[in-house]
């Protein structure tokens, strides 16, 4: 029997038991589902038989799912109020449980053609109390709930086990295949650490790899080989050159091995690997000079070197043909856009070249007004080039630049009429039209009366009229009133 069918049957039994409890407790039930006492006892008996049979079937099913085959029948799953199957089951439907399946054996009926009396019937008749019936039904419902929960738990566990088993079988290869893959990968790992001569000996034996190789091989990079086994060097990748400083590798003689140190970044460069013959070293030198010549524009800014390093390299380069200047990135105190080679210049000219930190100090001084820009230096043309420094200076100095332009105007322009910039010349026509309209509008107004031609009296005459003929003046020789000089006598 399938687990789904067992679960459905157990749920049906639970519904019937709940209906029986509702009738025994005289709860509200529709008229069609009401049962009398005899029907209740008979239904209780039938449900006990059916539940016992389903419990046994479920125990065998759970044992099969968990891959446990019990040799004995689980008596704990049988209800307490149900007698043994040999006593309660009719002879015609007697069932025998063998391991994980149920075989039904029909016994011949008795000669009289009647069934044996069931002991369960006597038990029910001897104890017809409804209280006992209700308790037994409640216990049966609890057992059914327990069986349902156990069935759901086991089914979910079996599903999860099958899911994990399928994932493992898909991802993990068999042990034999893993062993073969590991054995096949060993020659490949050994060949990475072999010299060229040893690889040529083993080249006849080819290693075959399986097509469906599911193992991920993580191999560490090969360690540096001894100098005698290396015939050349590889070109560094562009991404590595842009991210960090790469050592400048040059072929040297068999007896010479030089090490150069970067003073600015305190990074030790790799040992120089000698070439096998002189002809191979010359060919490699020409090829590397051609490869580096087109890429110094992007990597010159990140691969600067000090002057002391250039001096040590110039000594080691004396026994080799000259290389292109672009093939080696050298430190210059000027920014990366300058292409001058300061190592070729005499000592006096190198002293006059402004250092990088000094140039930064001058620019910061120009921004914060404690240092003035001197135009006699050779870098006075920096303002013409667009740069972030010039934009930053323009934000700080835009007001001062306008004042300096006003000071440079000629004297005739400043003393004459006020002049405006070319960009503020608009608006003359509009002003002319507004003046004409205003004149036309006020021309119709009544004009003021013309003033009389009579001469205006002076203020001192008005004072004489108001004060009755004269003004009291202290005794002085001469008093100036208005525009005339009056000589006063003592009689006044």
Curated annotation (Swiss-Prot):
Q: Does the keyword ATP-binding apply?
A: no
Q: List UniProt keywords, sorted A-Z.
A: Developmental protein, Fertilization
How is loss of this gene reflected in the phenotype of the organism?
A: Altered male gametophytic development with frequent single-fertilization events leading to reduced seed set due to undeveloped ovules. Increased levels of ARI14 in sperm.
Segments of skewed composition (Acidic residues): 256-270
Please list the GO biological process terms of this entry: double fertilization forming a zygote and endosperm; pollen development
Which ranges are annotated Polar residues under compositional bias? 317-336
Instruction: Map out region (Disordered) in residue numbers.
Output: 218-354, 394-426
Chain intervals with Low complexity compositional bias: 287-305
Where in the body, by tissue, does this protein show up? Mostly expressed in pollen and open flowers and, to a lower extent, in closed flowers.
Presence of keyword Electron transport: no
Compositionally biased tracts (Basic and acidic residues): 337-348, 403-412
Signal sequence annotation:
none
**General function of this protein:** Positively regulates reproductive function by facilitating male gametophyte formation and double fertilization.
**Additional detail:** Transcripts of KPL and ARI14, encoded by adjacent genes organized in a reverse orientation, have the potential to generate natural cis-antisense siRNAs (cis-nat-siRNAs) pair targeting ARI14 in sperm, thus leading to opposite expression levels during male gametophyte development.
Q: What is the name listed in the Swiss-Prot or TrEMBL entry for this protein?
A: Protein KOKOPELLI
Per the UniProt entry, what species is this protein from, by scientific name? Answer: Arabidopsis thaliana
């Amino acid at each position: 029997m399938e687990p789904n069918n067992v679960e459905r049957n157990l749920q049906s039994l639970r519904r019937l038991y709940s209906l029986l409890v509702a009738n025994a407790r005289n709860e509200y039930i529709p008229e069609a589902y009401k049962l009398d006492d005899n029907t209740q006892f008979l239904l209780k008996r039938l449900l006990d038989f059916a539940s016992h049979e389903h419990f046994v079937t479920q125990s065998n099913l759970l044992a099969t799912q968990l891959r446990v085959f019990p040799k004995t029948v689980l008596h704990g799953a049988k209800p307490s109020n149900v007698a043994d199957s040999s006593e309660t089951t009719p002879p015609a439907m007697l069932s025998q449980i063998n391991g994980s399946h149920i075989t039904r054996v029909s016994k011949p009926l008795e000669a009289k053609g009647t069934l044996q009396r069931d002991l369960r019937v006597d038990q029910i008749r001897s104890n017809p109390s409804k209280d006992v019936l209700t308790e037994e039904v409640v216990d049966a419902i609890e057992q059914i709930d327990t069986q349902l929960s156990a069935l759901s738990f086991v089914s979910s566990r079996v599903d999860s086990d099958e899911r994990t088993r399928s994932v493992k079988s898909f991802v993990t290869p068999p042990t034999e295949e893993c062993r073969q893959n590991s054995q096949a990968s060993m020659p490949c790992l050994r060949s990475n650490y072999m010299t060229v001569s040893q690889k040529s000996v083993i080249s006849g034996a080819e290693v075959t790899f399986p097509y469906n190789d599911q193992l991920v091989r993580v191999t560490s990079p090969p360690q540096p080989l001894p100098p005698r086994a290396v015939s050349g060097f590889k070109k560094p990748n562009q991404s590595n050159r842009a991210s960090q400083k790469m050592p400048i590798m040059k072929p040297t003689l068999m007896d010479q091995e030089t090490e150069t140190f970067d003073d600015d970044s305190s990074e030790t460069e790799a040992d120089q690997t000698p070439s096998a013959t002189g002809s191979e070293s010359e060919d490699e030198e020409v090829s590397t000079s051609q490869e580096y010549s087109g890429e110094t524009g992007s990597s010159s800014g990140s691969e600067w070197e000090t002057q002391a390093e250039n001096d040590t390299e110039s000594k080691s380069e004396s026994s080799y043909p000259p290389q292109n200047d672009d093939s080696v990135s050298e430190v210059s105190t000027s920014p990366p856009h300058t292409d001058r080679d300061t190592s070729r210049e005499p000592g006096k000219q190198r002293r006059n070249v402004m250092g990088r930190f000094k140039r930064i100090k001058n620019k910061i001084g120009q921004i914060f007004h404690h240092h003035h820009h001197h135009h006699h230096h050779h870098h006075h043309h920096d303002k013409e080039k667009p740069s972030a420094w010039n934009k930053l200076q323009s934000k700080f100095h835009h007001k001062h630049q306008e004042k300096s332009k006003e000071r440079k105007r000629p004297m005739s322009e400043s003393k004459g009429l006020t002049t405006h910039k070319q960009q503020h010349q608009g608006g003359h026509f509009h002003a002319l039209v507004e003046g004409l309209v205003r004149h036309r509008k006020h021309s119709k107004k009544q004009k003021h009366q013309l003033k009389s031609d009579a001469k205006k009296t002076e203020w001192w005459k008005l004072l004489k009229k108001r004060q009755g003929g004269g003004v009291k003046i202290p005794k002085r020789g001469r008093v100036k009133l208005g525009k005339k000089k009056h000589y006063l006598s003592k009689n006044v």
